[in-house]
Regions:
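Short hydrophobic/aromatic beta-strand immediately N-terminal to the Walker A/P-loop
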Residues: 244-245, 274
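Pre-ATPase regulatory/linker segments immediately N-terminal to the P-loop/RecA-like helicase/translocase core
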Residues: 5, 10-24, 28-52, 105-233, ...
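Conserved P-loop NTPase motor core of helicases/translocases
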Residues: 11-16, 95-96, 194-200, 204-219, ...
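Motif I (Walker A/P-loop) of helicase-class P-loop NTPases
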Residues: 255-263
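N-terminal pre-P-loop "Q-motif" helix
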Residues: 223-242, 257, 384
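Short, structured beta-strand/loop micro-motifs enriched in basic residues and often containing a Trp
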Residues: 94-105
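Walker A (P-loop) phosphate-binding loop of P-loop NTPases
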Residues: 251
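Conserved helicase motor core of SF1/SF2 NTP-dependent helicases
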Residues: 268-271, 279, 387-509
Length: 509
């Protein structure tokens, strides 16, 4: 469970000390003003309360739906599928794939289950009975394929119900990131804390300082003919500043610039680098671009949520092909033999057999951890969603450089997850004039959860590097957004003749 705002920060019975100091004392009221947080404690309490409010609202909506909506309304809204038969349909990197379909394999009808959604699997209702959570792998007209960590008992017996579920893991990881961000224990959090809270005299000057990252870097000539001048300027700033905001209006090549920056950082040996985004689609786009440029990139996250053509680059896929799998297979075979012999053993022999089983399990865990560390250490860039970067596999690993795409679509606590892994150089890519973060609770949104860290830092005074050439719109279509949102600074990278009207469409004179 997440700690409520104002309570002592703790995890599994441990209490962490929180740094309530600021680098500079200021007069005035406590709390946030114009993007500035005068005290870290206020920032922590504020966002802890908003996360709790958001979780409460999301849980309340789902519980209300499950307890009071009729089966007909749930199905008509596309939020539940009932009367489905289940069966096994293979595995995906060690997890079971289940197929759910009507007994006569008729069309499922209109529903809102899509790839990557969390589903709750139950017999008749998700309240009051044991449930299993899964993730949608694929949707078809007559069936859903769902990946589960543990399949339900008696899968082929009777029928099943599927409901759209809530993601508590995301809320828990955001709360933990808040605790890490404000912790003063060891090397937790980030050296950028003061500038991110706005507690420095001149935020822009502070952000422009060179990052303090130890290590030997190669000096590689930067020749980027594929970047236009504004993209190249943004990349150069990101390479030399401790905090850079890259603002990319529609069609200006945000992800293209992000990939070029990551590739240059990797070429100079500045890893390990953590590249994140709020959505799986955006992370996949970063990963694809990096792989195409020859960067050794590894994708963290369940393969079911990763684009099929990129799954070979996931950590799970690379672990499956790791040479140490042969050692693990031998140990598992030995363990299976001991299990088969157990019923015939008695007394001391049985005790020794149980000891051998436990010893083998411990050895398998050690080998699995070695495999994970070797794959991660070989990577130049590790790609993940913001939430995914809080996975236990990355516990204890520090990432001096963090690049975050889609930064304007992430609530601030989500952005803090990758940042709180020892970030010393931060690059935020996005556009606060486009989609804001998605927030369910109106109260939480109005009190600040709907504003991204990206936008707040601009309010503090950090100057964004604008990508000013767009390649998507007809020049006439560009005129309004350029004037309305970007101070007439947008230019065209395409001509009117390159954006003709669709054939057969009659335009009014």
């Amino acid at each position: 469970m997440m700690a409520r705002g104002g309570e002592a920060m703790g995890e599994r019975g441990k209490v962490r000390r929180m740094d309530n100091s600021s680098s500079e004392s200021r007069d005035g009221s406590e709390g946030e003003e114009s993007g500035i947080w005068r005290r870290g404690q206020d920032h922590f309490r504020h966002f802890s309360a908003l996360l709790e409010e958001e979780l409460k609202e999301e849980t309340s909506i789902i519980q209300e739906r499950w307890s009071s909506w009729s089966h007909h309304r749930l199905q008509a809204s596309g939020l539940a599928l009932l009367g489905l038969k289940g069966r096994m349909n293979g595995t995906l990197y060690g997890e079971d794939i289940l197929v759910f379909e009507h007994p006569d394999r008729q069309h499922l009808g209109q529903h809102r289950f899509t790839h990557g959604d969390i589903v709750v699997i139950s017999r008749s209702k998700p309240i009051g009975e044991k449930t299993v959570e899964g993730i949608v792998l694929e949707r078809g007209p007559t069936r859903l394929r769902v990946v589960v960590g543990q399949r339900p008992k008696d899968l082929r017996k009777g029928t099943w119900r599927l409901d759209r579920g809530a993601n508590r893991v995301a809320h828990d990881r955001m709360q933990e990131a808040l605790e890490m961000f404000h912790s003063v224990e060891g090397d937790r959090g980030t050296i950028l804390r003061d500038v991110l809270l706005g507690q420095v005299h001149d935020p822009e000057e502070n952000a422009s300082m060179r990052p303090k990252i130890s290590g030997k870097f190669q000096r590689v000539e930067r020749v980027h003919t594929e970047l236009n001048p504004s993209q190249n300027a943004a990349m150069e700033a990101a390479m030399s500043r401790r905090l850079t905001i890259i603002q990319g209006p529609p069609g200006t090549g945000k992800t293209h610039t992000a990939v070029a920056t990551l590739a240059q950082l990797a070429r100079e040996g500045r890893g390990p680098i953590l590249a994140t985004a709020e959505s799986n689609v955006a992370v996949d786009n970063l990963l694809e671009g990096l792989l195409n440029t020859g960067v050794r990139a590894v994708r963290i996250g369940r393969p079911v949520k990763v684009r099929e053509t990129l799954r070979a680059a996931t950590l799970d896929a690379q672990l499956e092909d790791h040479p140490k799998q042969d050692e693990i297979a031998i140990i598992r075979d030995e363990t299976d033999e001991v299990h088969r012999a157990l019923p015939k053993l008695k007394g001391r022999e049985k005790g020794l057999a149980h000891r051998d089983i436990q010893r083998n399990k411990k050895e398998i865990r050690r080998l699995e951890n070695e495999m994970i560390q070797s794959v991660l250490e070989n990577a130049e860039v590790i790609c993940s969603t913001n939430i995914g970067s809080g996975h236990r596999m990355l516990d204890g690993r520090r990432f001096p450089i963090v690049l975050m795409d889609e930064a304007t679509q992430a609530v601030e606590p989500s952005s803090l997850i990758p940042i709180s892994k020892g970030c010393r150089q931060l690059i935020l890519v996005g556009d606060h004039k486009q989609l804001p973060p998605t927030v369910i609770s109106r109260k939480a949104e109005q009190e600040g959860l709907g504003r991204s860290l990206f936008e707040r830092l601009i309010e503090v005074g950090i100057q964004p590097k604008l990508l000013d050439v767009q390649y998507r719109m007809h020049p006439v279509l560009r005129e309004f957004p350029s004037a309305r949102f970007y101070d007439n600074r947008l230019n065209d990278g395409c001509t009117a003749s390159q954006r003709p009207a669709p054939a057969g469409l009659l335009w009014p004179d």
